[in-house]
């Protein structure tokens, strides 16, 4: 649904040559640039545009059984294994975190696992600090956060690969926001975890899934994001090693509104002057909960059939869509879109 007809034809017409799919992977999966084929054509790794490699939990054989000559079947298998593999990396990184120094841990795992697990432990330690001594307990934890930030900054200044530097840059952005959030709560004299100052923040927990989620069986451990009364399952879409937005109070407010809307099965429409980061904020929120976000530029030439095709794709794969310049769509098409 998100590929042009020419691209679909090219993929399907070369079904006997699995490697011919490589140029189109970026359109199907946001964080994938290529996949690694072994000599026997088995697929063993996902490779991001930045060059990060993540092992698949089990190899995919496009040349065996029902997969042979059916590119659509092994691509579906790749989609499912992508979720399972990312979840496995997050789970292993979570178990490994308490066993070694953070500066050693954060250059060992894929960027996505590092950011998710760091946020889980920040949530856990912040709640422990508040329970232990309210704003005074939290003030002590802020000192630990500052020390952790200093260690990461020293690491960034050292000898690192381009990939590791990018991962740590994203981690520093997240850590600074976590530290600033805690400083604000100390200033606000927070006393318990149920205070709105803490409940209004994006919090990450590792807990049982309350419904069948992607790559998660009911009751298994998974990452759950919470903000105020809303909660959503982490999507495990592989996003590669991408940079994250610097979070401001307005970004936080937008996150609260959007997640609450999605929890109530609504959509959201950020509004404001051009170039202020509306689209990027929505994209960054999708990265925060690891869900694919497709950006679609609207125009007055768009008809209801094209929109219907897009909605089918969104419903089929569970991804988000950001309709840029939505106001350009003609009223006649908008009325049909509202019905759809």
Predicted regions and their residues:
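Pre-Walker A (Motif I) flank of P-loop NTPase domains
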Residues: 254, 264-268, 317-319
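Amphipathic alpha-helical packing elements
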Residues: 1-32
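Extended, charged/polar low-complexity intrinsically disordered regions
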Residues: 22-249
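Conserved RecA-like P-loop NTPase ATPase core
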Residues: 258, 279, 307, 311, ...
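Walker A/P-loop
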Residues: 263-296, 310-313
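Conserved AAA+/SF3 P-loop NTPase catalytic/coupling segment centered on the Walker-B
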Residues: 319-340
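N-terminal pre-P-loop "Q-motif" helix
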Residues: 246-258
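Flexible beta-alpha connector loops of hexameric P-loop NTPases
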Residues: 244-247, 293-303, 328-331
């Amino acid at each position: 649904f998100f590929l042009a007809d020419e691209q679909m034809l090219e993929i399907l017409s070369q079904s006997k040559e699995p490697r011919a799919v490589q140029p189109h992977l970026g359109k199907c999966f946001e964080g994938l640039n290529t996949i690694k084929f072994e000599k026997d054509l088995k697929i063993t790794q996902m490779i991001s545009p930045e060059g990060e490699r993540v092992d698949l939990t089990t190899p995919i054989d496009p040349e065996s059984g029902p997969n042979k000559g059916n590119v659509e079947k092994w691509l579906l298998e790749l989609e499912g294994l992508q979720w399972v593999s990312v979840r496995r990396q997050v789970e292993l990184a979570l178990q490994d975190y308490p066993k070694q120094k953070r500066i050693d841990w954060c250059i060992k795992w894929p960027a996505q696992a590092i950011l998710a697990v760091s946020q889980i432990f920040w949530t856990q330690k912040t709640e422990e600090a508040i329970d232990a001594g309210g704003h005074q307990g939290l003030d002590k934890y802020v000192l630990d956060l500052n020390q952790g930030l200093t260690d990461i900054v020293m690491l960034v200044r050292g000898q690192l690969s381009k990939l590791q530097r990018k991962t740590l840059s994203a981690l520093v952005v997240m850590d600074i926001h976590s530290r600033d959030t805690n400083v604000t709560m100390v200033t606000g004299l927070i006393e318990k975890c149920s205070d709105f100052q803490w409940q209004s923040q994006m919090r990450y927990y590792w807990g049982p899934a309350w419904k069948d989620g992607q790559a998660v069986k009911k009751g298994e451990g998974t990452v759950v994001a919470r903000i105020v009364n809303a909660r959503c399952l982490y999507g495990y879409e592989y996003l590669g090693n991408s940079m994250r937005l610097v979070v401001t109070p307005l970004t936080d407010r937008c996150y609260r509104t959007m997640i609450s809307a999605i929890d109530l099965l609504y959509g959201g429409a950020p509004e404001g002057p051009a170039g202020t980061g509306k689209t990027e904020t929505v994209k960054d929120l999708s990265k925060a909960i690891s869900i694919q976000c497709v950006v679609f530029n609207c125009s007055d030439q768009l008809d209801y059939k094209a929109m219907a095709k897009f909605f089918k794709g969104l419903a089929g794969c569970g991804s988000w869509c950001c309709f840029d310049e939505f106001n350009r769509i003609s009223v006649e098409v908008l009325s049909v879109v509202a019905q759809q």
